[in-house]
């Protein structure tokens, strides 16, 4: 995805362009002005790897206290044939895609994602905390 994200683009070129500063891919800016949500580094989010609500799928990874990483990295997606490589990248190259990782693992292609909760409707409309008592 040249110009859009820092990702490996072929199985022969296993890596993207190495780490890049935030903002190096202006075509990837979201409507909320968030940058680099895919590519560059996997982003550690404040979440343990668990099934989504209502999902009955089971995996041993749910029992291991793995952390969630999102966004894919410049290091590639694993070992796939040329035919399958871009298909796999296109499936995983999205901000919502998640993988799991041991929280003690040290990887050069893992960073973290800063985020904050969306304000409640009342906070957005009245610009006050909804749980504050009237004065």
How should these model regions be labeled?
Residues 50-51, 102, 121-123:
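Flexible, glycine-rich phosphate/dinucleotide-binding loops
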Residues 118, 128-134:
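Pro/Ala/Gly-rich low-complexity, hydrophilic intrinsically disordered segments
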Residues 73, 103, 126:
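Histidine-anchored, small-residue-rich loop motif
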Residues 97-103:
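Short, P/G- and charge-enriched loop/turn segments at secondary-structure junctions
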Residues 63, 104-106:
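A generic structural micro-feature
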Residues 1-94, 132:
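Functional-site microenvironments in short loops/helix caps that host divalent-cation chemistry
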Residues 108-124:
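Short, structured beta-strand segments at or near domain termini in extracellular proteins/domains
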Residues 123, 134-135:
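Low-complexity Ser/Thr/Gly/Asn-rich repetitive segments
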């Amino acid at each position: 995805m040249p110009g859009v994200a820092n990702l490996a683009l072929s199985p022969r070129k296993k890596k993207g362009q190495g780490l890049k500063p935030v903002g190096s891919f202006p075509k990837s800016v979201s409507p909320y002005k968030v940058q680099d949500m895919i590519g560059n580094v996997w982003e550690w989010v404040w979440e343990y790897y668990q099934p989504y609500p209502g999902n009955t799928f089971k995996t041993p990874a749910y029992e291991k206290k793995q952390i969630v990483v999102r966004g894919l990295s410049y290091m590639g997606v694993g070992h796939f044939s040329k035919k399958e490589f871009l298909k796999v990248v296109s499936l995983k190259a999205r901000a919502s895609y998640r993988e799991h990782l041991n929280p003690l693992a040290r990887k050069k292609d893992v960073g973290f994602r800063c985020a904050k909760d969306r304000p409640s409707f009342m906070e957005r409309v009245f610009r006050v905390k909804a749980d504050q008592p009237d004065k």
